[in-house]
Every structure is written in structure tokens, then in C-alpha cells.
Amino acid sequence: MVQASMRSPNMETFKQQKVEDFYDIGEELGSGQFAIVKKCREKSTGLEYAAKFIKKRQSRASRRGVCREEIEREVSILRQVLHPNIITLHDVYENRTDVVLILELVSGGELFDFLAQKESLSEEEATSFIKQILDGVNYLHTKKIAHFDLKPENIMLLDKNIPIPHIKLIDFGLAHEIEDGVEFKNIFGTPEFVAPEIVNYEPLGLEADMWSIGVITYILLSGASPFLGDTKQETLANITAVSYDFDEEFFSQTSELAKDFIRKLLVKETRKRLTIQEALRHPWITPVDTQQAMVRRESVVNLENFKKQYVRRRWKLSFSIVSLCNHLTRSLMKKVHLRTSEDLRNCESDTEENIARRKALHPRRRSSTS
């Protein structure tokens, strides 16, 4: 008989049983500051999953581990979603020190790793991947769930050994349900991909995800990052000023349709930014005539620069994301007088997930994070 933890009705219940009694725990897939991800096999079915062991914060005064409330929010959101382009939560266990999420195993690695191995890529092929991302986000936004951490590392492939791999959005640690009439502000995410309203500590909504999709698309087509500066301050300033361009060196073979799609996403005013429905209807994603379809087919992605910049980007991100996120927290904390420990937790959580993927988020059938 399964015993659930006794908690108030509005709190998530996790099984208070040893996960090892139901799953054979295998090799480590990744690790981070507050989580370890291991491959596992369900004893009753033989099916493989990924077990994410999240270290619980033991007291409010501590900054080690993840607070129960944040874990519950992530689990609550994952239990609400069921979509082909979103990772699936199978089960949740809890012991004295950890909460263990049993997640879908995604073995195809990151989308950008897959693209970096290709010899050529047309915009038509690129939009097939962007469309899958949009489909997953559309499902979330229909439920008024904002992901708040869309970035290349959180876009995985179910299986890379097929012509058009199936995309899975992962890592719902920062996801949040947007409630009508309830103002939500926070400092979180990976600075390179966060919207101006996050940097400025303004009310947040679904629009922040659309900005991130614009940044992801820009990088996918060129290898260059629109706002990443030489310093932390420059990156944040570029975001708030929406300071970017389509350098001819990187975008000489990019269609005007693709540039228009990006321009309409990288808009500072949230009301003027494309919604998810508008993005899906954009002619670069859904051509309205044969001419537009031909433009996509004949325009190509700058894979040479993509590969060159991607290797550099991966190294730079792994080296600098901790200091960049901490800078974002410190500077904005002074502005709004936030509690230091809680803001740093958000940044540390994001850093954890980046580190966790270094080892083997790529060779598996699911992602290390939800």
C-alpha cells in the first residue's frame, strides 16, 4: 500500500517510501549544487527513467538545498502538463534529505548539440524545430504557465537518430502559474536569455517566454548571441536597451522573414511582443503562399559560425554563469530591497541545472531536470 505524506490539501504529496524499493538506481547522468540525476529502471515494468535527487533545504536560515515550497511548485506544474513536446513526470518520492522526481528519460541530447553536428541546415528545417518549441510553449501558455527558463540547454531531443528529432522542453524549476490580477515579480533565469522586465524587476507574465524564444532563434540561425557582452554589466545593459543588430557577417544568408520573426519577439514593451499564437501564425513559421515557403527552403543557417561560436559559448557559459547570475541578483536586490538568501537561491538553482548537464544530459532518453 502506497503511503502519501500527510500535508494540507493545497500542498503536494510525495510517496514516503524508499525509491530503491521500486527502482534499480543506475549510473549518474549529471550532478549539480543541489541535485544528482541517475538513470533508473522500474522493477515492476523494466522501463527506464531518470531519477532526479533534489537535496531539501533543512531550515529557513540555511542556503543549502532547495526549499520545499519550490519543489512543490515544480511538481504541481509537472503534474498538470501532458504534451508531446514537454517532459513527463512519472512519480515522486521523498525521504529525510531528498525529494526524488522520476522523470521521462530523454536520450537524444540537446538540440543545439545535434545541430552542431550537421553539415547543412535550411531555414525550413530550422523552423521545424522552432515550431515544436512553440507548440510546447503554446500548451503551457494555454494553461497560463510560464516556463521562465527557456534556453538551449533546456531544449532536448527524445531521439536524435531520426531525420526530424522530437523536441522535449525540460527543467520546470522556475516555471510559474500566472494568475489574473496577481502581480508576480522575481529575479531568476539565465541572464543571456531573460527579458528586460526580469532585469528591471517589473511584473512578469507569459511574455517573458516569447523574448527567450527570440534569443534562441537568433542564436540558432547565426551562432551569435544578440545581447551577450564582454562584461556582466554590458550584457544586462544590452538587454534593457534592446541593443542588438543583424550583423552581415552572421546573417548574410538569413531571410527577411526570419529576421522579422526575431524583431517582433525582441520587443521591450510586453504588449507589443508577439504572443505565442501570433508567433505560430507568423509567415516564417506558417507560410501563407509558395513564395514564402520557397524563401525558407532556399535560405540557410550559418552553421559554420554556429559550430564555432557554440563551442566557445558552451565553455564561456559553464565558466561565467555563476558570477553573472550573482551580479544580476546583487544589483537588483539593492534596487528593490529583496531578501538576499531567497534571490540567491533562484540563481543557484539555475546554475545547478547548467552544471548538471555537463556530464551526460545528452546520452539519455530524458533530461536531468524537469
Curated annotation (Swiss-Prot):
Q: Where in the cell is it found?
A: Cytoplasm; Cytoplasmic vesicle, Autophagosome lumen
| GO MF annotations, alphabetized | ATP binding; calmodulin binding; identical protein binding; protein serine kinase activity; protein serine/threonine kinase activity
List the GO biological process terms: anoikis; intracellular signal transduction; neutrophil migration; positive regulation of eosinophil chemotaxis; positive regulation of neutrophil chemotaxis; protein phosphorylation; regulation of intrinsic apoptotic signaling pathway
Listed under catalytic activity are:
L-seryl-[protein] + ATP = O-phospho-L-seryl-[protein] + ADP + H(+); L-threonyl-[protein] + ATP = O-phospho-L-threonyl-[protein] + ADP + H(+)
* Classification via InterPro entries: Kinase-like_dom_sf, Prot_kinase_dom, Protein_kinase_ATP_BS, Ser/Thr_kinase_AS
Q: In which tissues is it expressed?
A: Expressed in peritubular interstitial cells of the renal cortex. Isoform 1 is found in the adult brain while isoform 2 is expressed in brains of embryos and young mice (at protein level).
Modification Phosphoserine occurs at? S299, S318, S349
Protein kinase domain: residues covered: 23-285
What regulates this protein's activity? Activated by Ca(2+)/calmodulin. Regulated by a double locking mechanism, involving autophosphorylation at Ser-318, calmodulin binding, and dimerization. In the inactive state, Ser-318 is phosphorylated, and the kinase is dimeric. Activation involves: dephosphorylation at Ser-318, release-of-autoinhibition mechanism where calmodulin binding induces a conformational change that relieves the steric block of the active site by the autoinhibitory domain, and generation of the monomeric active form of the kinase.
Phosphothreonine-modified residues are T369
The answer to whether UniProt assigns keyword ATP-binding to this entry is yes
The active site of this protein is located at: D149 (proton acceptor)
Q: Which key words are in the record?
A: Apoptosis, ATP-binding, Calmodulin-binding, Cytoplasm, Cytoplasmic vesicle, Kinase, Nucleotide-binding, Phosphoprotein, Serine/threonine-protein kinase, Transferase
What does UniProt say on post-translational modification here? Answer: Autophosphorylation at Ser-318 inhibits its catalytic activity. Dephosphorylated at Ser-318 in response to activated Fas and TNF-alpha receptors.
Q: According to the UniProt record, where is the region Autoinhibitory domain? A: 292-301
**Residue sites binding ATP per the record:** L29, G30, S31, G32, Q33, F34, A35, I36, V37, K52
- Reported EC number(s) for this entry are 2.7.11.1
General function of this protein: Calcium/calmodulin-dependent serine/threonine kinase involved in multiple cellular signaling pathways that trigger cell survival, apoptosis, and autophagy. Capable of regulating both type I apoptotic and type II autophagic cell death signals. The former involves caspase activation, chromatin and mitochondrial condensation while the latter involves caspase-independent cell death in conjunction with accumulation of mature autophagic vesicles, plasma membrane blebs, and nuclear condensation without DNA degradation.
Domain note for this entry? The autoinhibitory domain sterically blocks the substrate peptide-binding site by making both hydrophobic and electrostatic contacts with the kinase core.
Per UniProt, subunit arrangement is: Homodimer in its autoinhibited state. Active as monomer. Interacts with 14-3-3 proteins YWHAB, YWHAE, YWHAG, YWHAH, YWHAQ, YWHAZ and SFN; the interaction requires DAPK2 phosphorylation at Thr-369 and suppresses DAPK2 kinase activity and DAPK2-induced apoptosis.
Q: What is this protein called?
A: Death-associated protein kinase 2
Highest lineage ranks of the organism? Eukaryota, Metazoa, Chordata, Craniata, Vertebrata
